[in-house]
Amino acid sequence: MTSNRSTAWPAPAKLNLFLHVNGRRADGYHELQTLFQFIDYCDYLDFAVNDSGSLTLHSEMEAVVANSDNLILKAAKSLQEYTGTHQGAEIWLDKKLPMGGGIGGGSSDAATTLVALNHLWQTQLSQDELAKIGLSLGADVPVFINGLAAFAEGVGEKLIPVEAPENWYLILTPDVHVSTAEVFNDPLLPRDTPKLSMDDLMSSDWHNDCQPRVAERYPQVAKALAWLIEYAPSRMTGTGACVFGIFDTRQQAEHVFAKLPAGLCGFIAKGTNKSPLALRLTQH
């Protein structure tokens, strides 16, 4: 069964280098402006294609997330239905990214599943078609499929590739799961940050409108930010809970990481404007 196993398909994390909430639409979704950048810290997926059409997932997450709710299986099923293929796959997930951390782990896993199976099943969908399927699974999935650092606005689906500084990051992972829906439903969330042009945004001070509310509701996030900001410019990514400090070199990040107090966990990663998934695809 595993002789045709295609291995080590990366599902990278992302950071929101800024996240501005510009308003709320009539349908309840929020108008955002944000900048996505990938980091070289990833989940990894293996795939073994079959002709039976069956889809199975092996993961230490099985006890945490029901298969019916798993975005990996939803992505594979969506690709089957969209293309009409009779092929299936056995999938293995090596989970390294924290869930509910604001670094896109579930969305990235779904994107890697779509990109890898489109290649392995030879269903030959375009990137735009894959992104359309991805958007039905989650607002962040298309950026992982496109594979380039991007400025996004709307609900996050309008993407413009950008070249952001590829800094080193120390990312702290508070042991708390932040609900995105809960954050965006918070009546005290700022929703009136003025919309700016991309040029203005790229030259202005960056912030995350969700950060003050999350820090107030989750002391673990506030603690991580308070410690990290003593050493480097620091912000929360997405709706949290992860926070990141920005460094020019790996050595600087490692120097601060070595001082990490008990009770805080994290990792060091490099920002990259081209997704490791896009690079993996070119190796075939």
UniProtKB/Swiss-Prot annotation:
ATP binds at P98, M99, G100, G101, G102, I103, G104, G105, G106, S107, S108. Its EC number is 2.7.1.148. GO terms for biological process: isopentenyl diphosphate biosynthetic process, methylerythritol 4-phosphate pathway; terpenoid biosynthetic process. It holds the Pfam family GHMP_kinases_C. SUPFAM superfamilies: GHMP Kinase, C-terminal domain, Ribosomal protein S5 domain 2-like. InterPro entries: GHMP_kinase_C_dom (IPR013750), GHMP_kinase_C_sf (IPR036554), GHMP_kinase_N_dom (IPR006204), IspE (IPR004424), Ribosomal_Su5_D2-typ_SF (IPR020568), Ribsml_uS5_D2-typ_fold_subgr (IPR014721). The active site is at K14, D140. GO terms for molecular function: 4-(cytidine 5'-diphospho)-2-C-methyl-D-erythritol kinase activity; ATP binding. It comes from the Bacteria. Pathway: Isoprenoid biosynthesis; isopentenyl diphosphate biosynthesis via DXP pathway; isopentenyl diphosphate from 1-deoxy-D-xylulose 5-phosphate: step 3/6. Keywords: ATP-binding, Isoprene biosynthesis, Kinase, Nucleotide-binding, Transferase. It is an enzyme of class 2 (transferase). It catalyses: 4-CDP-2-C-methyl-D-erythritol + ATP = 4-CDP-2-C-methyl-D-erythritol 2-phosphate + ADP + H(+). Belongs to the GHMP kinase family. IspE subfamily. Catalyzes the phosphorylation of the position 2 hydroxy group of 4-diphosphocytidyl-2C-methyl-D-erythritol. This is 4-diphosphocytidyl-2-C-methyl-D-erythritol kinase. It comes from Shewanella loihica (strain ATCC BAA-1088 / PV-4).
